[in-house]
Amino acid sequence: NAATILSFFISEKILTKKQTENFAQKIGSDVILGLNRLSKIYYSDGKIYEIKKSLKYYLVLVKPNFGCSTRKIFSFNKVFSKKQFSKSKKNISKNIIFNSKNDLENSAFKAHPKLKQLKNQLINWKKAEFVRMTGSGSTLVMYFNSNETAKNALKTFKRRLNNSWCILSKVI
């Protein structure tokens, strides 16, 4: 992935941090999120806040065999909520993350009803703490408190969703 390559260029002193950030912005707005291992909140105005306190979640990422056009999803979206996070909050708790939302989900679901069906199927698997869509889609992320539970979910959904890409990860 692009962020990994750019991180390598920083570590080998091929590019400066500023040059790397410029390239990341040109490649895609979310590339900058992967330049280091800190968890981040990406604001709608393009600003990024790094979370110092590590949150312990184990993740199962599920990507269906179709993608979502960012341009199309944003064109469907009419309402954007106000910021839920302020930069003055030093500690982002699990409760804040749990209660957050992605304004683009409803637009993605209108464009791709199968994506909504997939999210409902993931939510109905009660062992996940919650399920979120990444950016403008189409990847869905299941959040778990336990690595073992996440591994079991991965096995289950790899069998059930043979047309989807599924992988295990964790918040680092």
Name each model-derived stretch.
Residues 41-130, 145-163, 167-172:
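Conserved, helical-rich catalytic subdomain that frames metal- and/or nucleotide-binding sites
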Residues 1-24, 33-35:
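DPxDG-like acidic metal-binding loop motif
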Residues 1-10, 130-144:
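Glycine/serine-rich anion-binding loops at beta->alpha junctions
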